[in-house]
Amino acid sequence: IYLLNASILNGIFAVLTYKLFLEFELDKKSSFFYTICVAILAYPSSGTPFVDHHSTFFSIISIYLLIFAIKKEKLVYWILLPFLLCFAFLSKQVPATYIFFSVIFLIIYNFIFRDEKKITNKKIFYTLFFSSSIIIILLLVFFSFSGIDIQSFIDQYINYPREIGQNRYLNLNYNFKKIIIDFKFIHLIFILLIIANINNLIKEKKFLKK
């Protein structure tokens, strides 16, 4: 059952990743290759995804859905978005909370600057409100049948993790080795990506001038 759970979750993640690459007009062969790489990287070494993996998968999928919702302008993606964010938060609060606020910021930014074509901002807002209301109702029903007190849920999922995070933050020791040396390969990849993006911007500016 655990392996089946891992396979299904990773399979859904891989399919949506492939769909995302195609959405950005990457050719099918490259999309398939990169999707295989993502699927191999995403599959946990233990074979069974822990709460961290579930929260990360659901958080990334919610970002995918936001991209699809903005590009395709279909309400089904806006309906599913709150559910994925909820699944991510219930799996583990971090990184779900960071992704949640990032998604909220992007939605507000999209509302301000988007051109209302197929779907109006009002319809999107009502859709998100309706979907979020369903989630809250389902959670309350689940709490009622399971005999879970709402305050206990708040303590376990919000107050307790916040106290742990606060203690860890206060005990952090910032130094050059921990920030730079221990993560040198990650920083190297970031530098290469920045150089590649700057190079692309320069090429685009030259192309536009022509």
Positions of predicted regions on the chain:
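Perimembrane helix-loop-helix junctions
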Residues: 98-134, 200-208
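Short acidic/glycine- and proline-prone juxtamembrane loop motifs at membrane-interface regions
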Residues: 6, 45-56
